[in-house]
Structure formats: C-alpha cells, structure tokens
C-alpha cells in the first residue's frame, strides 16, 4: 500500500494561465470513521480509492487505488448520494512539481484548493504566487 504525502492550500488570484491541462472530475465518498472510500469518474474511466487516517500533521496517509470499469464506477458513485462533488482540475507545473488546482462547482462553488504531492514531509518546493493559506490536515 502506498503512502500519499501532500500539502493543500487555498488559492487566490489567477492560476489558470499557467495550466497545461484541465479535466472535469466527479467524485463521491463513503466514509467510515477515519477511513474513506472515494469513487472518481473522469471522462470514460472510473477509479476507487481507499484512504486511511492522516498522521498528526495531516500530510501523510495510506492510500490504495485501482481503476474500475466505468459502468461499475457509476453504480458505486450513485451509492455516495449527497457525499459527492463536481470540479475542474488544472495541472500547473511549478519548479520540479505539478500543482493540482481544483475549482469546485455546485454546493462548493467558489472553493479553489491547490495540492502538491511530495516524496517526504520535509521536501521543499517552490511556492507559486497563487497559493494562499495552507489548509493541510
């Protein structure tokens, strides 16, 4: 099982001009205590991800992910009910990292969050000007 190490930030200002790609994502969650199952639908592909609880700082947690046939992912997505989101994800290269900036729609309209995956909790990274308050954890 892989460990996911990431930091998250609110976003302010123009971030779209440096995006190299954008994709529409629908995802739903089934949560049981500190463990969550995420069903993600991207175009014609589906994924299931199980995430464990985060460490004290919230930057690291165990994650297991597999691709699913789209028809199965759509069935599981329906089971998530109101625990679903709709967003556009922009990929923005900055230095040696790719920032994933999510612009939410629907009930979360106006929320924009950037995340960067790291190889360790202590890895340094170049902070782009569009990053605002850190919300990791």
Where do the language-model regions lie?
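Phosphate-end processing signature that detects enzymes handling 5′-triphosphorylated RNA
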Residues: 1-137
